[in-house]
């Protein structure tokens, strides 16, 4: 049985291990950045009828930044030519994390992905959610 996983994202500053610091007000690049989010698995009922919960903070590497975009007028519908790349991963690795607050939960693990590289690219709907980004 597949159980849904609820995630809430809490932004954290980039780790201090980077050789150069990025000024978020001026960067026009895409960077790997560390994020922390709260992962919550759905509650279950144990054999005594008591609810058992499972959650914990998870740190992942993700992409963050800004990309140059443009639009120019055109004589054909939709009367514009759009160029809107997004900051997205160029590689990722999967890992399994054990959540910290899961006493009595049968499987306290979740699968997460870490970005290994980031770049400004056009959205790929086969691997990313591209709503309202493709034109």
UniProtKB/Swiss-Prot annotation:
The keyword Secreted applies. It is found in: Secreted. Residues 1-19 form the signal peptide. One of its GO terms (molecular function) is toxin activity. Gene3D superfamilies: Cystine-knot cytokines. Keywords: Disulfide bond, Hormone, Secreted, Signal, Toxin. Belongs to the glycoprotein hormones subunit beta family. This is Thyrostimulin beta-5 subunit. It comes from Conus victoriae.
